[in-house]
């Protein structure tokens, strides 16, 4: 956050005081300003970041080290990042390639027609696997199919694959930081899927919190700009977000 000059076009004269990458803006927008805060964005892919404070942590578990943000005159804050390329894109694949659903949001009701995945598991490696595996040769796969498997099982398996990938990202972060996250902050289009969010909470055994404003990237960079102009401490970011919904784990340890 700094004074980068003024806009020359569109709205001439408007000062530019914050420039953030997509996921860094989401991290700040989720008020992840303390070491150990962690968020995951559920969009076309999944992108998890955890604030590591002023410490540059080099991952031994397949994650990337990145700058989180820096306010002019202050030390930079760093983060660990894990990314998976296919999350919501797998739902689009069900819709556009297999014609199993008409609209992306239909996947939740279809998946709920079955009580579980029927032992069907999906690996959405359409473009290889990113964090923490980094295997460009991996390809998508469906496992556990029987003559009793149906499209509801497939829908549930696709949703669960998103949660399993996120589990791997957070597990890698916890190993690198030698910690155990208490909760996860979430944003992105797939947060509207209650079945996915509950399953995510269940397998992580952690509470999950969404925000009232789901366009968290825009919120993050907008508030960052405002805080710099008004010379306000970064801790006041909490004044601009409101928790929307919380999912708590409801799965037995045996099942997990």
Label every model-predicted segment.
Residues 52-256:
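Glycine/Thr-rich phosphate-binding loops that ligate phosphate moieties of nucleotide
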Residues 3-37, 50, 54:
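Conserved phosphate-binding catalytic cores of ATP/NTP-utilizing and phosphoryl-transfer enzymes
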Residues 27, 34, 46-48, 86, ...:
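Glycine-rich nucleotide phosphate-binding loop and flanking beta-alpha elements
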Residues 30-32, 38-41, 83-84, 111-114:
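A general structural signal for short secondary-structure junctions and capping/turn motifs
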Residues 20-25, 44-45, 200, 215:
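Conserved glycosyltransferase catalytic-site signature
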Residues 1, 31, 45, 83, ...:
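Anionic group-transfer/hydrolysis microenvironments
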Residues 25, 47, 220-224:
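Contiguous, well-ordered alpha-helical segments that form the cores/surfaces of helical PPI scaffolds
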Residues 20, 39-45, 49, 68, ...:
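Short beta-strand segments
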């Amino acid at each position: 956050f700094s004074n980068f000059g003024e806009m020359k076009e569109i709205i001439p004269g408007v000062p530019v005081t914050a420039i953030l990458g997509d996921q860094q803006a989401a991290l700040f927008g989720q008020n992840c300003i303390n070491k150990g805060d962690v968020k995951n964005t559920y969009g076309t892919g999944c992108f998890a970041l955890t604030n590591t404070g002023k410490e540059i942590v080099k991952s031994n578990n397949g994650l990337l080290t990145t700058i989180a943000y820096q306010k002019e005159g202050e030390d930079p804050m760093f983060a660990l990042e894990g990314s998976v390329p296919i999350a919501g894109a797998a739902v689009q694949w069900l819709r556009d390639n297999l014609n199993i659903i008409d609209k992306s949001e239909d996947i939740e009701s279809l998946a709920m027609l079955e009580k579980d995945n029927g032992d069907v598991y999906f690996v959405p490696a359409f473009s290889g696997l990113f964090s923490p595996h980094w295997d460009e040769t991996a390809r998508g796969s469906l496992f556990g199919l029987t003559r009793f498997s149906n499209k509801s099982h497939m829908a549930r398996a696709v949703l669960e694959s998103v949660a399993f990938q996120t589990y791997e990202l957070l597990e890698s972060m916890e190993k690198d930081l030698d910690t155990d996250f208490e909760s996860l902050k979430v944003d992105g289009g797939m947060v509207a899927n209650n079945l996915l969010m509950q399953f995510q909470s269940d397998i992580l055994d952690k509470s999950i919190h969404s925000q009232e404003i789901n366009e968290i990237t825009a919120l993050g960079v907008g508030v960052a700009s405002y805080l710099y102009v008004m010379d306000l401490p970064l801790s006041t970011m909490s004044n601009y977000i409101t928790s929307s919904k919380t999912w708590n784990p409801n799965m037995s340890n045996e099942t997990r």
